[in-house]
Amino acid sequence: MRALLKKDFDTLTKHYKMYVILLVFFLFAGSVSTTDEFFSTFPMVICSWFTANLIAYDEKQEGSSASGRKLYVQSKYLFQFITVAFSMIVCVSGLSSRYGVGSADFCNVLLMMLAAAFLVPAVMLPIIFKNSAEKSTLKYLAVLIIGVAMCYYFSAAFEARYIAHISLGLVIAAGLLMLALYFLSYRLSVKYYEKREI
């Protein structure tokens, strides 16, 4: 597992430097921005780009299943989780200084970040592992666009109606539910990938 993760990080920094630079830019912008929620949530979407592009790179190199298919899927989900966790730590530190931990605005943006971090890849990765990254490009982009649009739409609707009642406990409960869906997505991806002909 460690070797697979190291390979992914090496591939990312060697072949996808622009994505890394883009992530750093948005992490910095998200940590200092005083109003725009987009800069706080978009880094989570970029992390999904990382994972999808790494899978596509592996498929071109014909080395995606060299270490066993289940272990390979595990490494991609763990890589996604690590990059998202790092990004969230940076962005949440900015949110806490901007809004204050536990405030309604803080909880609302954090909820949107969690959705972008876990719901988008939970839908996207099984599609990729079932069909291959190349065949799933349009579906992947559709999931990203729809997912981000839904995050903003429901966030705005939620904020307008319930923001006064949102609490950190509710956000934590929602986050745990999203993690459970992320785990179910992993199980589904393993099932699809083990059955797929390569």
Language model feature labels by segment:
Residues M1-K60, Q74-I198:
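Hydrophobic alpha-helical transmembrane segments of membrane proteins
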Residues G63-R69:
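Short helix-to-coil transition segments within interhelical loops
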